[in-house]
Protein backbone atom coordinates (compact mmCIF):
# COMPACT_ATOMS: atom_id res chain seq x y z
CA UNK A 1 0.00 0.00 0.00
CA UNK A 2 1.48 3.31 -1.07
CA UNK A 3 1.88 5.89 1.71
CA UNK A 4 1.16 9.52 0.89
CA UNK A 5 3.89 12.12 1.15
CA UNK A 6 3.83 15.00 3.63
CA UNK A 7 2.96 17.39 0.80
CA UNK A 8 0.07 15.19 -0.34
CA UNK A 9 -1.28 14.99 3.22
CA UNK A 10 -1.05 18.76 3.65
CA UNK A 11 -2.82 19.26 0.34
CA UNK A 12 -5.60 16.89 1.38
CA UNK A 13 -5.99 18.67 4.74
CA UNK A 14 -6.37 21.97 2.88
CA UNK A 15 -9.03 20.36 0.70
CA UNK A 16 -10.90 19.23 3.81
CA UNK A 17 -10.66 22.72 5.28
CA UNK A 18 -12.12 24.02 2.04
CA UNK A 19 -15.03 21.58 2.39
CA UNK A 20 -15.59 22.80 5.96
CA UNK A 21 -15.59 26.45 4.85
CA UNK A 22 -18.07 25.58 2.09
CA UNK A 23 -20.24 23.80 4.65
CA UNK A 24 -20.24 26.86 6.92
CA UNK A 25 -21.39 29.04 4.04
CA UNK A 26 -24.27 26.64 3.37
CA UNK A 27 -25.36 26.90 7.01
CA UNK A 28 -26.56 30.44 6.26
CA UNK A 29 -29.58 28.70 4.75
CA UNK A 30 -32.11 27.76 7.47
CA UNK A 31 -32.98 24.44 5.82
CA UNK A 32 -29.29 23.53 5.73
CA UNK A 33 -28.97 24.53 9.40
CA UNK A 34 -31.79 22.14 10.26
CA UNK A 35 -30.06 19.40 8.26
CA UNK A 36 -26.92 20.08 10.31
CA UNK A 37 -29.00 19.65 13.49
CA UNK A 38 -30.24 16.28 12.20
CA UNK A 39 -26.63 15.23 11.69
CA UNK A 40 -25.60 16.41 15.16
CA UNK A 41 -28.25 14.07 16.58
CA UNK A 42 -26.61 11.15 14.80
CA UNK A 43 -22.98 12.17 15.26
CA UNK A 44 -23.00 14.28 18.44
CA UNK A 45 -19.62 12.95 19.58
CA UNK A 46 -17.90 14.30 16.46
CA UNK A 47 -16.67 17.88 16.22
CA UNK A 48 -18.85 20.31 14.27
CA UNK A 49 -16.32 20.48 11.43
CA UNK A 50 -16.22 16.69 11.08
CA UNK A 51 -20.02 16.66 11.04
CA UNK A 52 -19.89 19.09 8.10
CA UNK A 53 -17.36 16.83 6.34
CA UNK A 54 -19.59 13.79 6.82
CA UNK A 55 -22.58 15.77 5.52
CA UNK A 56 -20.63 16.88 2.46
CA UNK A 57 -18.96 13.59 1.56
CA UNK A 58 -21.98 11.36 2.18
CA UNK A 59 -24.26 13.70 0.20
CA UNK A 60 -26.67 13.65 3.11
CA UNK A 61 -27.07 9.87 3.34
CA UNK A 62 -24.81 8.83 6.26
CA UNK A 63 -26.62 7.30 9.22
CA UNK A 64 -23.88 5.76 11.40
CA UNK A 65 -20.13 5.96 10.77
CA UNK A 66 -17.07 4.32 12.33
CA UNK A 67 -13.49 3.49 11.44
CA UNK A 68 -12.44 0.17 9.90
CA UNK A 69 -11.27 -1.27 13.24
CA UNK A 70 -14.39 -0.09 15.05
CA UNK A 71 -16.63 -1.87 12.56
CA UNK A 72 -14.48 -5.00 12.91
CA UNK A 73 -14.87 -4.90 16.71
CA UNK A 74 -18.65 -4.86 16.20
CA UNK A 75 -18.45 -7.94 14.02
CA UNK A 76 -19.03 -6.03 10.79
CA UNK A 77 -16.55 -5.92 7.93
CA UNK A 78 -16.17 -3.02 5.49
CA UNK A 79 -16.76 -4.16 1.93
CA UNK A 80 -13.68 -4.39 -0.27
CA UNK A 81 -13.25 -1.33 -2.48
CA UNK A 82 -15.13 1.08 -0.21
CA UNK A 83 -13.27 4.41 0.04
CA UNK A 84 -14.99 5.85 3.08
CA UNK A 85 -15.11 9.48 4.17
CA UNK A 86 -12.14 11.58 5.25
CA UNK A 87 -12.37 13.53 8.48
CA UNK A 88 -9.85 15.15 10.83
CA UNK A 89 -8.62 13.16 13.81
CA UNK A 90 -6.79 14.38 16.90
CA UNK A 91 -3.36 13.31 18.14
CA UNK A 92 -0.91 14.73 20.65
CA UNK A 93 2.38 13.83 22.25
CA UNK A 94 4.41 15.16 25.15
CA UNK A 95 7.22 17.49 24.11
CA UNK A 96 10.55 16.56 25.74
CA UNK A 97 13.90 18.31 26.01
CA UNK A 98 17.21 16.85 24.84
CA UNK A 99 17.52 14.93 28.12
CA UNK A 100 14.12 13.31 27.69
CA UNK A 101 12.39 15.37 30.37
CA UNK A 102 8.90 16.78 29.67
CA UNK A 103 8.93 20.46 28.70
CA UNK A 104 6.58 22.77 30.59
CA UNK A 105 5.06 26.17 29.97
CA UNK A 106 5.44 29.20 32.23
CA UNK A 107 2.71 27.84 34.52
CA UNK A 108 4.44 24.48 34.88
CA UNK A 109 2.00 22.58 32.68
CA UNK A 110 3.38 19.90 30.34
CA UNK A 111 3.63 21.03 26.71
CA UNK A 112 2.00 18.82 24.11
CA UNK A 113 2.43 18.89 20.36
CA UNK A 114 -0.98 18.60 18.75
CA UNK A 115 -1.82 17.64 15.18
CA UNK A 116 -4.89 16.61 13.22
CA UNK A 117 -4.29 13.56 11.03
CA UNK A 118 -6.70 12.54 8.31
CA UNK A 119 -8.73 9.48 9.32
CA UNK A 120 -11.19 7.41 7.31
CA UNK A 121 -14.66 6.46 8.49
CA UNK A 122 -17.25 4.28 6.77
CA UNK A 123 -21.02 4.50 6.80
CA UNK A 124 -22.89 1.40 7.95
CA UNK A 125 -24.14 0.96 4.37
CA UNK A 126 -20.52 0.17 3.40
CA UNK A 127 -20.21 -2.93 5.55
CA UNK A 128 -21.25 -6.57 5.69
CA UNK A 129 -23.46 -6.82 8.79
CA UNK A 130 -23.25 -9.58 11.32
CA UNK A 131 -26.87 -10.74 11.65
CA UNK A 132 -26.45 -11.05 15.41
CA UNK A 133 -25.45 -7.41 15.66
CA UNK A 134 -28.13 -4.83 16.33
CA UNK A 135 -27.36 -1.21 15.63
CA UNK A 136 -27.42 0.83 18.87
CA UNK A 137 -29.29 3.64 17.09
CA UNK A 138 -31.94 1.18 15.95
CA UNK A 139 -32.29 0.01 19.56
CA UNK A 140 -32.85 3.58 20.69
CA UNK A 141 -35.47 4.26 18.06
CA UNK A 142 -37.27 1.02 18.83
CA UNK A 143 -37.32 1.90 22.49
CA UNK A 144 -38.68 5.41 21.91
CA UNK A 145 -41.29 4.81 19.21
CA UNK A 146 -44.05 4.71 21.82
CA UNK A 147 -43.20 8.18 23.14
CA UNK A 148 -45.93 10.75 22.43
CA UNK A 149 -45.14 14.42 21.72
CA UNK A 150 -45.43 16.60 24.80
CA UNK A 151 -45.04 20.34 25.19
CA UNK A 152 -43.53 19.93 28.65
CA UNK A 153 -40.73 17.75 27.21
CA UNK A 154 -39.98 20.45 24.65
CA UNK A 155 -39.89 23.10 27.38
CA UNK A 156 -37.64 21.02 29.64
CA UNK A 157 -35.15 20.37 26.83
CA UNK A 158 -35.18 24.03 25.79
CA UNK A 159 -34.58 25.27 29.33
CA UNK A 160 -31.91 22.62 29.95
CA UNK A 161 -30.07 23.91 26.89
CA UNK A 162 -30.29 27.46 28.25
CA UNK A 163 -28.87 26.28 31.57
CA UNK A 164 -25.95 24.49 29.90
CA UNK A 165 -25.12 27.33 27.53
CA UNK A 166 -26.24 30.61 29.06
CA UNK A 167 -26.35 30.32 32.84
CA UNK A 168 -23.18 32.37 33.33
CA UNK A 169 -23.97 35.18 30.87
CA UNK A 170 -23.27 38.68 32.24
CA UNK A 171 -26.28 40.84 33.11
CA UNK A 172 -27.89 42.30 30.00
CA UNK A 173 -26.05 39.97 27.60
CA UNK A 174 -29.09 37.82 26.83
CA UNK A 175 -31.14 40.82 25.76
CA UNK A 176 -28.43 42.01 23.37
CA UNK A 177 -28.17 38.70 21.53
CA UNK A 178 -31.51 37.07 22.22
CA UNK A 179 -31.82 35.72 18.66
CA UNK A 180 -28.56 33.78 18.94
CA UNK A 181 -29.25 32.34 22.38
CA UNK A 182 -32.82 31.33 21.56
CA UNK A 183 -31.62 29.67 18.36
CA UNK A 184 -28.99 27.74 20.33
CA UNK A 185 -31.53 26.54 22.91
CA UNK A 186 -34.19 25.63 20.35
CA UNK A 187 -31.61 23.86 18.16
CA UNK A 188 -30.36 21.76 21.08
CA UNK A 189 -33.93 20.92 22.13
CA UNK A 190 -34.75 19.90 18.54
CA UNK A 191 -31.73 17.57 18.37
CA UNK A 192 -32.44 15.91 21.72
CA UNK A 193 -36.17 15.55 21.00
CA UNK A 194 -35.52 13.97 17.63
CA UNK A 195 -32.96 11.61 19.18
CA UNK A 196 -35.61 10.55 21.72
CA UNK A 197 -38.17 9.85 18.99
CA UNK A 198 -40.43 12.79 19.81
CA UNK A 199 -42.39 14.76 17.21
CA UNK A 200 -40.28 17.79 16.19
CA UNK A 201 -42.79 19.57 13.94
CA UNK A 202 -43.45 22.16 16.65
CA UNK A 203 -39.82 23.28 16.74
CA UNK A 204 -39.15 26.63 15.07
CA UNK A 205 -35.60 27.48 14.00
CA UNK A 206 -34.97 31.17 13.36
CA UNK A 207 -33.80 32.51 10.01
CA UNK A 208 -30.02 31.99 10.21
CA UNK A 209 -28.95 35.14 8.42
CA UNK A 210 -31.14 37.10 10.82
CA UNK A 211 -29.40 36.14 14.06
CA UNK A 212 -25.93 35.64 12.55
CA UNK A 213 -25.79 38.79 10.45
CA UNK A 214 -24.16 36.58 7.83
CA UNK A 215 -21.04 36.13 9.99
CA UNK A 216 -19.31 32.83 9.19
CA UNK A 217 -17.40 32.99 12.49
CA UNK A 218 -20.60 33.41 14.50
CA UNK A 219 -22.23 30.54 12.63
CA UNK A 220 -19.22 28.31 13.45
CA UNK A 221 -19.31 29.28 17.13
CA UNK A 222 -23.04 28.67 17.38
CA UNK A 223 -22.77 25.33 15.55
CA UNK A 224 -20.18 24.13 18.07
CA UNK A 225 -22.09 25.47 21.10
CA UNK A 226 -25.16 23.57 19.91
CA UNK A 227 -23.18 20.37 19.30
CA UNK A 228 -21.54 20.46 22.74
CA UNK A 229 -24.80 21.00 24.60
CA UNK A 230 -26.60 18.35 22.54
CA UNK A 231 -23.79 15.89 23.23
CA UNK A 232 -24.07 16.55 26.97
CA UNK A 233 -27.84 15.98 27.00
CA UNK A 234 -27.84 12.92 24.72
CA UNK A 235 -24.95 11.32 26.63
CA UNK A 236 -26.88 11.83 29.89
CA UNK A 237 -30.01 10.33 28.32
CA UNK A 238 -28.02 7.35 27.01
CA UNK A 239 -26.50 6.77 30.46
CA UNK A 240 -29.91 6.96 32.13
CA UNK A 241 -31.45 4.62 29.56
CA UNK A 242 -28.71 2.00 29.98
CA UNK A 243 -28.90 1.88 33.79
Which residue ranges define each predicted feature?
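N-terminal accessory/interface modules of nucleic-acid-binding and processing proteins
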Residues: 1-243
Amino acid sequence: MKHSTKEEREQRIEQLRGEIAEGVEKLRDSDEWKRYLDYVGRFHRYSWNNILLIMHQSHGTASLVAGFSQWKERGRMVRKGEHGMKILGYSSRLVRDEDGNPKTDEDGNPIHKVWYPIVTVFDREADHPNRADTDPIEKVHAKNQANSPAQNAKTILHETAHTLLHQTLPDGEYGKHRGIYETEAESVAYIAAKWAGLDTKQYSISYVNGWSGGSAELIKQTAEHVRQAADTIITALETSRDQ
